[in-house]
Regions:
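N-terminal glycine-/serine-/threonine-rich beta1-alpha1-beta2 phosphate-ribose binding loop
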Residues: 1-120
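ATP-dependent carboxylate/acyl-activation modules
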Residues: 2, 297-351
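Conserved active-site and cofactor/substrate-binding residues in soluble primary-metabolism enzymes
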Residues: 8, 12, 16, 36, ...
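Rossmann-fold NAD(P)-binding glycine/threonine-rich loop
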Residues: 102-121, 130-158, 162-167
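Conserved anion/nucleotide-ligand pocket segment
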Residues: 168-229, 234
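Substrate-binding/catalytic subdomain of NAD(P)-dependent oxidoreductase enzymes
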Residues: 205-301, 308
């Protein structure tokens, strides 16, 4: 039976997943027994369409590319237009909500309300929005469990690189006592350019903005706020240790000068913005701050916009994972992985 999907938000990431589902349709069916049907899309700017029998995804993508609006999706019997996000979640025949709306990370809204509306209806949610997971992890986890719904958010930390799923599956049985990571590609790109090309912070930031790595207002990245939300998610989900955003000390890279970079190079070291969470005396101490790393540190070799994370395990020792931390297809893939997890659980139940 095909999974019926409703997209809340349909920007770059949502369209990335839609392209994957279209292009890998037969491979997913053959290799995973996975079939999906997009029945609804509700986007604040692009419009809203719903058909219980499914939408033609190639037509959707073509219409958006040519006109930018779902209002130009062709009419057909049974097509419904204009439903808002909450009604789309509650009243469509979707069993899984793809939550990729534009959300205020400081409040987690409207994505938190979207999750609650879905869980109340017993519908699964997969998402890439950090805010709800960092700000309402316990509440939403309990709500999903109470209503028998799956809540997937792999893409909130390192895009499609499995920073959450890998430790849960492959490191099970270990006590993970510390997590250290380069969780923001923008800041790592800036520091790498300063180190390799000898340019100033300002010049490296400008280049990052021109390449699309950094926003016009780069504060979320360069002040460490983005990484702070991610380390909170890692602490709660991977270390099973409650941690709030306000408990994380946060210092960005704006104070790092070219002189600091050159001095570190002379010492055989490298500056990186490190997100850290460590268990101490029964609680977790977490911080975001620039650190001067020895060459032997596995995080010191991570350059450009790549992300990486190191898990300190009581049985296995140090394990480091690196990979893409952003990108249309990469983040779309993170949603696919959560959908495949739902599919595998469904297959186990059916057996």
């Amino acid at each position: 039976m095909a999974h019926k999907l409703a997209f809340i938000g349909f920007g770059v990431v949502g369209q990335g997943l839609a392209e994957i589902l279209r292009d890998k349709k037969e491979a997913l069916k053959q290799n995973e027994g996975f079939e999906a049907e997009i029945v609804a899309i509700s986007d604040l700017m692009k419009g809203s369409i719903y058909h219980p029998g499914g939408l033609d995804i190639s037509t959707v993508l073509q219409v958006l590319q040519e006109t930018g609006s779902l209002e130009n999706y062709p009419e057909r019997p049974g097509l419904i237009r204009g439903w808002d996000s909450i009604r789309t979640i509650k009243d469509t025949n979707a069993d899984t909500i793809i939550e990729v709306s534009y959300t205020d990370v400081k409040t987690g809204q409207p994505a938190i309300d979207h999750c609650k509306a879905a869980f109340e209806k017993g519908k699964n949610v997969v998402m890439t929005n950090k805010g709800p997971v960092a700000l309402a992890y316990q509440e939403l986890s309990e709500m999903a469990q109470r209503h028998g719904a799956y809540w997937g958010f792999e893409g909130t930390v390192m895009s499609g690189t499995p920073a959450l799923r890998m430790p849960a599956a492959a490191l099970a049985g270990n006590d993970i006592t510390e997590i250290r990571g380069i969780l923001n590609g923008t800041t790592n790109y800036i520091l790498t350019q300063m180190e390799q090309d000898g340019v100033s912070y300002e010049a490296a930031l400008k280049e990052a903005q021109e390449l699309g790595y950094a926003e016009a207002d780069p504060a979320s990245d360069v002040e460490g706020y983005d990484a702070r939300y991610k380390i909170v998610i890692l602490s709660n989900h991977v270390m099973n240790a409650p941690l709030s955003v306000g408990e994380v000390e946060c210092k960005g890279i704006t104070g790092i000068t070219l002189q600091d970079i050159e001095k570190a190079k002379a010492e055989g070291k490298s500056w990186r913005l490190i997100a850290k969470a460590k268990k101490e005396n029964g609680k977790v101490i977490a911080s975001i701050a620039p650190e001067k790393l020895d060459a032997e540190d596995p995080l010191a070799s991570i350059r450009g916009s790549v992300n990486a994370i190191t898990y300190q395990c009581d049985l296995l020792g140090t394990v480091t994972l690196s990979g893409a931390g952003a990108g249309k297809i990469e983040t779309g893939f993170s949603l696919l992985i959560d959908l495949i997890s739902i599919n595998r659980e469904r297959q186990l139940i059916s057996i």
